[in-house]
Swiss-Prot record:
Membrane-spanning intervals of the chain: 1-21
Assembly and interaction partners: The Tat system comprises two distinct complexes: a TatABC complex, containing multiple copies of TatA, TatB and TatC subunits, and a separate TatA complex, containing only TatA subunits. Substrates initially bind to the TatABC complex, which probably triggers association of the separate TatA complex to form the active translocon.
Protein name per its UniProtKB record: Sec-independent protein translocase protein TatA
Similarity annotation: Belongs to the TatA/E family.
Keyword annotations: Cell inner membrane, Cell membrane, Membrane, Protein transport, Translocation, Transmembrane, Transmembrane helix, Transport
Membrane as UniProt keyword: yes
GO MF entries: protein transmembrane transporter activity
Superkingdom in the source lineage: Bacteria
Basic and acidic residues bias spans: 39-50, 64-76
Length: 76
């Protein structure tokens, strides 16, 4: 009585199919698949966003920054 055989599970599956209908079960499977795919894409997007933010230019020039080489060449 502790474990169910394959026949018990087949009977349960047939009853569930009769109650909900195969179309409803198929649409639930599709919805679950879309949810899993959306979750995976969301997790993949989390990894991509910090890499894009870190790709900012490493040198930031402000108005007070002077390029010495350019200044020396213009004086020569």
């Amino acid at each position: 009585m502790g474990s169910f055989s394959i026949w018990h599970w087949l009977i349960v599956l047939v009853i569930v199919a009769l109650v909900f209908g195969t179309k409803k079960i198929g649409s639930m499977g599709t919805d679950v698949g879309k949810a899993v795919k959306g979750f995976k894409d969301g997790m993949k997007g989390e990894d991509d966003k910090p890499a894009a933010q870190n790709a900012a230019p490493s040198q930031v020039a402000d108005k007070g920054t002077v390029d010495v080489e350019v200044k020396e060449k213009s004086n020569s």
